[in-house]
Amino acid sequence: LRGITPAMKAQAPREPPQTEAAPPQPGTDETAQIEAGGLQGDMGWGPGWSVLTQATFIEQFHYAFPSAYEGQNSFGSEAEAEHTFSFSLFLGRRLWEGGELFFDPEFFQGYGLSRTLGIAGFPNGEAVKAGFANLHYNTSRLFIREAFGFGGGKETLEADPRQFAGEEDVDRLVLSVGKFSANDFFDDNDYSHDPRTQFMNWALWESAAWDYPADIVGFSDGAVAEWNTRSSTWHYGIFMEPTESNGAREDYHLGKAHGQILQFDRRYIVGGRSGTTRWFAYWNQAHMGSYAVAAQQQDPEDIILTRSYRSKVGLGSSWNQELTESIGAFLRASWDDGRTESFTFTEVDRSVAGGLSIAGKSWRRPADTAGIAAVVNGLSANQRHYLEEGGTGLILGDGALSYSPEEILEAYYEFRPWHGLEFGPDFQYVRNPGYNSVRGPVSVYAVRAHVEF
C-alpha cells in the first residue's frame, strides 16, 4: 500500500440531500450504522456547533493490457499504480433559528491512474482531474442554509456535513447559498452516491451524462431551493460555470454562463420496504466547443478553436429500493444532447447503470457492506466522430477510435470493525476503455480505507 496515507478526491463526493435524513443501510441497526452519505455526530464544541471530519485513502493498480495504439489522453496500457488521499473538516454553526453556516476546508493529494484520463467511467471517484503531488488545500464548501417551516408535523434530522441534528417541519422550504458541490443536493441515491464508502466508479456514484457545473476539483458557487413534504421533494439549483473546460476560474458572464437543474423525488413504501424515485432535467450554458463545427474546420481535432457561448440539455433518473432486510437495489439512467463538448464532469452522453448493496447480516457482520454493479456508457454521433478523427476531449483521446460502448463491472467489500472505520477491496473490469474496441479489457484493483468521526 506504499504505507497507508488515505485518498483524494474527484468531483466532489456526495452527501445525502440536506432536506431529508438518509434511510438506514439495509440490515444494519441504527446504532451500528455508518451513514453512507457522510459523517454523523457532533464533536461537542458546545451548543450551536457541529464538528465532523473524514479521511479517505485509495490505492489502485492495474496490470498491462492489450492495446492496438495509444494517444494523448489514453488510459496507459502498461502496468501502473497510483493513490489518492483526502482529508475534510466539516464545521457548522447555528446562526439563528432555522439559519446555519457551514465551512468545509479540505486537503487532497495523489493522482488517478494515467493522470485521470482514458476511461469515461473512471474507476476512482476520489481522483481530481488535475492531481496533486503534495497536499493541496481547497475551501470546498462555504454556505448558509436557511429553513422555513410550514407545518405538516415534525421530522427528526440527523447531523451530517450539510445540516444540524434536530427537528424541523415536514413541510419546509430550505434555501442554501454559497459554495458547494451541485451533487451535494442533486442526483442522490441511497446505495451509490459516495465513492468514499460505496461504489467508486464515476458512472455509478453519479449520473454520468449530467455534466454538472464545477471547477477542477468539483465545486461551484450557487444557490439551491428545496421544497420538502412527507413523500416528495422538489429541488431547483443554479450554479456558476468555469471559464473553460475543466477550468479553475468561474465565468462571471452570468447571463450566458451558468447551469440550472430541476429535480423531483418521490418516496414510497411497498410491502413494508422503502424506495425512492428521482427525475431531473438540466440546462447548461457555457463557453463550449461544438463537435459539428469542429468537424467542418481545417483542424477537426481541436475543439477549443470552436468555443463560443452555447447550451447543453440533459435528462436523468434514478431509483433505489430496499428489497429485503439486507439487500437494496439501485438503477440510474441519464442522457444529454451530445452537441457540445463535455465540459466539467466526464465524456458520456448516454448511460445506464444498476446494482445491489448487500449488508453483512446474513454472514454475521451486520455493519459490513458488499456491492456489485454494472454500467454501460455511450457517446453521441457527433462526439464519436470527433474522437474518430483524432480529437481530444475532457479526458478522452486515443488518436483514433474503433467505437464500442464502454462496459464496466464493479464489486467492493467494506469491513466496518467499529463505528467510524471502514476498509476493504474493490475490483473493476472495464471493457472498451474510452469506447475503443481495440484497447483492453483492463482489470483495476483497489484497496480503500475510510475514517470518520
What are the residue ranges of the model-derived segments?
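Transmembrane beta-barrel strands of outer-membrane/channel proteins
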Residues: 55-61, 103-107, 175-179, 236-240, ...
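Surface-exposed coil loops of outer-membrane beta-barrel proteins
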Residues: 117-140, 151-263, 301, 390-401
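N-terminal periplasmic/intermembrane-space "pro-region" immediately following the signal or transit peptide
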Residues: 1-80, 90, 94-96, 100, ...
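Residue-level signature of outer-membrane beta-barrel architecture
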Residues: 93-95, 105, 146-148, 179, ...
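Outer membrane beta-barrel transmembrane domains
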Residues: 265, 280-309, 337, 341-430
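Short loop/turn motifs that connect adjacent beta-strands in outer-membrane beta-barrel proteins
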Residues: 39-51, 63-64, 92-101, 149-172, ...
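Hydrophobic, lipid-facing positions within transmembrane beta-strands of outer-membrane proteins
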Residues: 49, 83-89, 138-144, 173, ...
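Outer-membrane beta-barrel "beta-signal"
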Residues: 140-153, 372, 441-453
